[in-house]
UniProtKB/Swiss-Prot annotation:
Protein name, entry field: Phosphoglucosamine mutase
EC number of this enzyme: 5.4.2.10
Keywords on record: Isomerase, Magnesium, Metal-binding, Phosphoprotein
A GO CC term attached to the entry: cytosol
Cofactor: Mg(2+)
UniProt: Mg(2+) binding residues: 100, 241, 243, 245
Gene3D superfamilies the record matches: Alpha-D-Glucose-1,6-Bisphosphate, subunit A, domain 3, Alpha-D-phosphohexomutase, C-terminal domain
Organism: Methylorubrum populi (strain ATCC BAA-705 / NCIMB 13946 / BJ001) (Methylobacterium populi)
Residues annotated as the enzyme's active site: 100
Annotated cofactor note: Binds 1 Mg(2+) ion per subunit.
Catalyzed reactions per annotation: alpha-D-glucosamine 1-phosphate = D-glucosamine 6-phosphate
Lineage of the organism: Bacteria, Pseudomonadati, Pseudomonadota, Alphaproteobacteria, Hyphomicrobiales
Gene that produces this protein: glmM
Length: 446
């Protein structure tokens, strides 16, 4: 049973769940586990722009150096940049201090192995066992303590990496781009990358103060970006989240393009170019049925996983896919990155736009999403989904939807909530089905 790690590292209220004491122990435990071989061991640490990042970074440095690991400090950098630099700098482990799209009061710790991939369940459980144990006998001697060093050239390294995901002949000349960096980790690298590729760049969400990350900006609050795109008559808007591992696109009309539409546009282009390593892509159970029908219409298949980019990536690696993601904008292109990379995904989409010489709206709106309704049911205890009345209601709902829709019911991984989602061609039927299941779950949870 997991105590500290969730589906995306350790996350919670800063100085509540994520305390200096916990960060110290995480550094010590991870340092002990990844000290293999007889070379000098080191860890790469990046963070987003939250005020609590300083506190957590300092505690992690103390933890890693106390067990003999050297620390390379990157400062504010996107999560995918930390994963890339972990590999590039031959580090034994990478750490990202971020709570992604959450408000500034929260923070988190994500860990990457030397290959740049997030740690598997077994390693996370091993780290948990050490966190809760006695580390005193694992500490390094006075002569063997690690050293910490701040690296200055990391922004240029990541910018060059992002640019190299495009062929050298591809530029963004002639595109007016508004980029919203959520006052987060990409506030320096994203505008600079786009400018170096030739775009006219208007940057918003690039004034972090420790408190304003994700506040009314970024991929989870794109209204200001929509307004700016329309106001400036820009060709495209790009919204990243606080750690820049997800992206949302806004077309020249101010219409939002979610992860499903983005994956559809890229999949169509990659199929034409014979770039897909498997005849399809990987998405989650929450992706719209319209995406599945569009992908099937291309002669491709859509594999579905549980919610969470780690499950998408696991399926991609196991079955050899190079494209996958989530409706929320976590897009994984494994030819380039070991995790979701919002900037790289945006660049790949813009390369399709440039090649086809069409407006973003014509490239990105590949299918009409089916009506989708999601409702949450809170419960205090027990397992309401096991109740006979709920099982019967779910079976009846699926029969009513038939082949024209889908029903997805799942417990939240972070709170006592059951999510009921249905989609289908008939909006009225979808609404009825959701209400019936919600009523049954609510009664069972009472």
């Amino acid at each position: 049973m997991r105590k500290h790690f969730g589906t995306d590292g350790i996350r919670g209220r800063a100085n509540g769940i994520i305390t200096p004491e916990l960060a110290l122990k995480v550094g010590q435990a991870a340092g002990v586990i990844f000290q293999r071989g007889d070379h000098r061991h080191r860890v790469v640490i990046g963070k987003d722009t939250r005020l609590s990042g300083y506190m957590i970074e300092t505690a992690l440095v103390a933890g890693f150096t106390s067990v003999g690991m050297d620390v390379l400090l990157l400062g504010p950098m996107p999560t995918p940049a930390v994963a890339m630099l972990t590999r590039s700098m031959r580090a034994d482990i990478g750490v990202m201090i971020s709570a992604s799209h959450n408000p500034f009061e929260d923070n988190g710790i994500k860990l990457f192995g030397p290959d740049g991939f997030k740690l598997n369940d077994e390693l996370e459980l091993e780290i948990e066992s050490l966190i809760d144990g006695d580390m005193r006998r694992r500490l390094a001697g006075s002569r063997d303590l690690g050293r910490a060093k701040r690296i200055e050239s990391v922004h240029a390294r990541y910018i060059e990496f992002a640019k190299r995901t495009l062929p050298r002949h591809v530029t963004l000349d002639g595109l007016r781009v508004v980029v919203d960096c959520a006052n987060g980790a990409a506030y320096r690298v994203a505008p600079e990358t786009l400018w170096e590729l030739g775009a006219e760049v208007i940057a918003i969400g690039v004034e972090p103060d420790g408190f304003n990350i994700n506040r009314d900006v970024g991929s989870t609050a794109p209204e200001s970006l929509v307004q700016k795109v329309r106001e400036l008559r820009a060709d495209v808007g790009i919204a990243l989240d606080g750690d820049a591992d997800r992206v949302l696109i806004v077309d020249e009309k101010g219409q939002k393009v979610d992860g499903d539409q983005l994956m559809a546009a890229v999949a169509r282009s990659w199929k034409e170019d014979e770039r897909l390593t498997q005849p399809g892509l990987v998405a989650t159970i929450m992706s719209n049925l319209g995406l599945e029908r569009f992908i099937n219409g291309l002669g491709l298949t859509l594999a579905r996983t549980a919610v969470g980019d780690r499950y998408v990536l696991e399926h991609m690696r196991e079955h050899g896919y190079n494209l996958g993601g989530e409706q929320s904008g976590h897009i994984i292109m494994s030819d380039y990155a070991t995790t979701g990379d919002g900037l790289v995904a945006a660049l790949q989409l813009l390369s399709v736009v440039k090649r086809r010489n069409l407006p973003v709206s014509e490239v990105c709106h590949c299918f009409e999403p089916l009506p989708q309704i999601l409702k949450n049911v809170r419960f205090r205890s027990g397992e309401p989904l096991r109740a006979d009345s709920v099982v019967t209601a779910i079976a009846h709902a699926k029969d009513r939807l038939g082949q024209s829709g889908r029903l997805v019911i799942r417990p939240s991984g972070t709170e006592p909530v059951i999510r009921v989602m249905a989609e289908g061609d008939d909006h009225a039927l979808v609404a009825e089905v959701v209400d019936e299941v919600v009523d049954a779950v609510t009664r069972a949870a009472a």
